[in-house]
Amino acid sequence: MQPAVHKYLSALEAGDAERAASLFVPGGWVQSPFLGRLSVRDYVNKVASASSKAHLTVYDVLVSAEGHLRAVAYYQYDWSLKDGSNVTFDCADVFNFDSDTGRIESIVLVYDTDPVRAVVQNKYP
């Protein structure tokens, strides 16, 4: 699970929706407190369309010890928007994996939206 998490975060950082989607089961989705629930392609494309540069510093990836296949990535997101504004925030992404294929089913993002909203507002195209 950890390799898939790191591959996804790398694809997100690069704004590569196709690479990100290749890690998911068909119909895979991302739930963002800012953007709501979107297909993985739509989510990565939306973030990339507002970005000029992104850098993720991964603090830790935690893997479930029992029950559903799950991992949590805890990282710092340094995000530069196309208008030149910048925002930095900590994020915890909860990854749910398909037990048959080992691919990602969904990701639920957890972060404080207040500093993000203050900078991003409605700069998504």
What label would you give each PLM region?
Residues 1-26:
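Short acidic-aromatic low-complexity motifs
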Residues 17-70:
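A solvent-exposed, acidic/Ser-Thr-rich amphipathic alpha-helical stretch
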Residues 24, 77-79, 111:
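Short beta-strand segments enriched in hydrophobic/aromatic residues
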Residues 29, 85, 102-103:
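Residue-level signal for well-ordered, solvent-exposed loop/turn and beta-edge residues enriched
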Residues 44, 57-63, 77, 90-97:
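Hydrophobic/aromatic beta-strand elements that line small-molecule binding cavities or substrate pockets
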Residues 53, 78-88:
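Short, cysteine-centered beta-strand-loop-beta hairpins and adjacent loop/turn segments enriched
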Residues 70-77:
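Short, well-ordered beta-strand segments in beta-rich or mixed alpha/beta enzyme
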Residues 90-125:
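Short beta-strand edge/turn micro-motifs at domain boundaries
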